[in-house]
Every structure is written in C-alpha cells, then in structure tokens.
Amino acid sequence: LISDCKIPKGSVVCDLGSGQGLTSVFIAAEYGFKVYAADLWSDPCENREFFESQGLSEAEIIPVKADAADLPFEKSFFDAVICVDSYNYFGRDREYLDSRLLPFVKQGGYVYIAVPGMKKNCHDNLPQELLLSWSPEQLEYMQEISYWTDIVSASGQAEVIEVSEMESNEEVWADWLVQENEYAVNDRAAMNAGGGRHLNFIKIVLRKK
C-alpha cells in the first residue's frame, strides 16, 4: 500500500480503523511516523500495552477510541491517513470523504486506503463458492475497482492519484487463512472452493487539494 510512500518521515498519521494496532506498529516503527491509532471497537488501554510491548512509547504511537464518522481531532491535524481493511465499512457514502475525513487532513496531505474487493461486479449473480463463507449482505462490502473509483471521484476535495488492484492478493489471503481466529476459519470454505479467483485487494491513493 505504501511501498512508494509520499508521506515524509516524522509526519503525523492517523491509522483509521486500526483494530488491535498491527498496522500502527508497522508504520510507526518502519516509517518513523507519529501515529494515532483510531478505532471504535478496540480498547485503547489494551492497545497501549501492546504498543509498549513492541518498544513504542506515546511519543510515537497514541491509541484513540474514535468513530470514523465523528473523529475527535482538530481540523487539518494529520499529514496523512492510512486505512487498511476498514474503509469499505464506512466509506461507501459518497459524502464521507469531504464531510467526515478530509477536514482533518492538511492541504496536500495523503490518504492511503486498502480494501478487500472483487475483480468484477458479480452481486447480481453471486458465485456459490463465495456464499460458502459470506452472506450476500456481507459481500456488499466487497466491490470492484470501478465502484471505488466512482466513490472517491465524487469528492470535491481530493485528487485521485490511484485506484488499482494490489499485487499481494494471494500472499495476503494465504497469511490470513492460516490464522486461527473465527473470521479466518470461516473464510476458508470459500477460498478452498476457489472463491479467491473472484476477489482482490484494492489500493486507493488520494491527495487533499
């Protein structure tokens, strides 16, 4: 997602929808960002303990309980936002970027997004192998490149730099499916039946005008 990162070292970055903070740790340690790990469902105290166990202090990474639709930060606070595997839950609203997210990004700042997606729109005729693991309602959160291009292009405040299929599709799925958490276990039926040929991961890069 950020292999060609345009965010300078030392930037203040929001990891939006950070979960338990794995991405937050990576971008703080590897890229030297000051990271705000913002998530509605995780416990900031537990995340802080995890960050400290990884040798990262609050000077480098700060856990924040935050709703993506009502972020508790000053306007133009962040140099960049990175959002991995969560934007598809709240960002399908065409108004979201301009009204809920970009106000907190500095002019010229970047937004990097990675979402699970589909190679093509098949929602009107869902492959049976996908239905082994997910309901039609759950699959609505997986959309194709043209869908996301249309969504982000509706923003009046963002320059669309890139919307493309990520190269790491098979590697990411392989790493995920060996996990023993209930979600990974549930996904195995579809993927073992060949469902992966319909799926991808989509990279979105935006720059605030």
PLM-predicted stretches and their roles:
Residues 140-156:
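Short alpha-helix
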Residues 80-93:
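A short SAM/SAH-binding and catalytic strip from SAM-dependent methyltransferases
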Residues 14, 20-70:
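Class I SAM-dependent methyltransferase SAM/SAH-binding core
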Residues 69-81:
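A short acidic, Gly/Pro-enriched loop at the edge of an enzyme's catalytic core
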Residues 1-9:
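Conserved alpha-helix/loop element of class I SAM-dependent methyltransferases that forms part
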Residues 162-209:
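Conserved Class I S-adenosyl-L-methionine
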Residues 116-138:
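Short, glycine-/aromatic-enriched active-site segment of Class I SAM-dependent methyltransferases
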Residues 95-110:
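A short glycine-rich, Lys/Arg-flanked "PGG" loop and its adjoining helix->strand segment in the class I
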